[in-house]
Design a protein with these regions (language model features):
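Conserved GNAT acetyl-CoA-binding A-motif
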Residues: 116, 123-136
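Conserved catalytic-core motifs of GNAT/GCN5-like acyltransferases
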Residues: 133-135, 145, 150-166
Length: 171
């Protein structure tokens, strides 16, 4: 069984992120990189030197509704605002989980839960966050529900990535 790590990710982390989240959609190498990766909190599971599950979180600025771009490269799809941030109906500071993924050969073994739990722990204990938000691909919604996250907002589509739902968890 792998163990969860956090800190500054190496290239293997980004290779796993690309292999799981972008390459299957035919997106170019580099689309796995986000403009704020250097400031984000990263967690991953490593097993025998192989990065098998990844995820990241960032604090949503106090003046932001969470809208933005899907990645830092050209042609990035827009990401909609989170309703509770736009209407000021959730507690700040708030954080967003992004880029969660597990290699297909290691899925359904609890690795994503380890990564998500570590990100939640770090954002609450080290950054004082009170609310978490994320945009889940449709197939991932049952996983996030099992971890205590609730659906908010209506379904929407993010470019070639596909249908998503926004979710929230209060801490």
């Amino acid at each position: 069984m792998g163990h969860v790590l956090h800190g500054t990710p190496d290239e293997a982390y980004f290779q796993t992120r690309y292999a799981v989240l972008r390459e299957p959609l035919g997106m170019p190498l580099g689309s796995e990189r986000l403009s704020d990766d250097a400031e984000a909190v990263h967690a991953w599971v490593q097993d025998g030197g192989e990065v098998i599950a990844v995820g990241r979180a960032h604090i949503i600025p106090a003046n932001s509704d969470g809208s933005g771009a899907d990645h830092k490269g050209p042609g990035a799809a827009p990401i909609p605002a989170f309703g509770p941030l736009a209407t000021h109906s959730c507690e700040r500071p708030a954080f967003q989980i992004r880029q969660m993924g597990t290699l297909p050969s290691h899925q359904r073994r609890g690795y994503a839960a380890l990564v998500l739990g570590e990100l939640e722990r770090l954002m609450v204990s080290e950054h004082g966050c009170k609310t978490g938000l994320l945009q889940a691909r449709e197939h991932a919604i049952p996983f996030y529900k099992s971890q205590g996250w609730s659906l908010i907002d209506e379904p929407y589509t993010i470019g070639v990535i596909g249908p998503h739902r926004s979710m929230m968890k209060e801490f």
